[in-house]
Amino acid sequence: MNKLRFWFNNARPISLPQSMLPALTAVALSYSRADGAQFSWLAAIASLFGVMLLHLGMNLLDDWFDYKKGSAQAREQVANEGFRGRMVKYPYLTSGEATPKQLLGAVGGFLAFAAVMGAVVILVRGWMILGWVAATLILGVSYSGALSSLVSGD
């Protein structure tokens, strides 16, 4: 349980409103349009947990990409120029509390459980959800600059 709490806290749960509010809005709109006839609480709850797990996993993946890019030095430079901000994005890596390999394991865990939630939604609602999931994953990985790094060779 301590490992789960460790990774949950380092996945920056403070950022969850960014993804959970739109997801909750979608559930509320779906419920109001369904008149109770075709609304599935199972799909709604699985969707909400899936969004949360995906967001946390992508936050950790972003840390991994930043760690690999060496963004700590860039943050120090910005601070030296007088700008304020969060100086250490991944203190659990720089302090030695976790290794990059453990971080990737945590990312895999969050994304695997998100995939299970997605499978529940697919079973209830059909395969069309996969397009949304694929788009979300592409955007999430792109946010970290991974795709642009792969294309440019950095």
What do these predicted regions represent?
Residues Y90-D154:
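Intramembrane alpha-helical segments
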Residues M58-G109:
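Aspartate-rich (DDxxD/NDxxD/DxxxD) Mg2+/diphosphate-binding motifs
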Residues R5, I14-Q18, L42-A46, Q102-G109, ...:
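Alpha-helical transmembrane segments of integral membrane proteins
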Residues Y31-D35, D63, Y67-S71, L123-W127, ...:
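Transmembrane helix-loop junctions in multipass membrane proteins, especially transporters and channels
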Residues M1-N9:
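Short, Lys/Arg-rich, polar N-terminal cytosolic tail immediately upstream
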Residues L24-T25, L29, G36-L61, G131-V141:
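Membrane-embedded alpha-helical segments that form the functional core of polytopic membrane enzymes
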Residues F8, P22, L53-L54, F110, ...:
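Hydrophobic residues within membrane-embedded alpha-helical segments of Major Facilitator Superfamily
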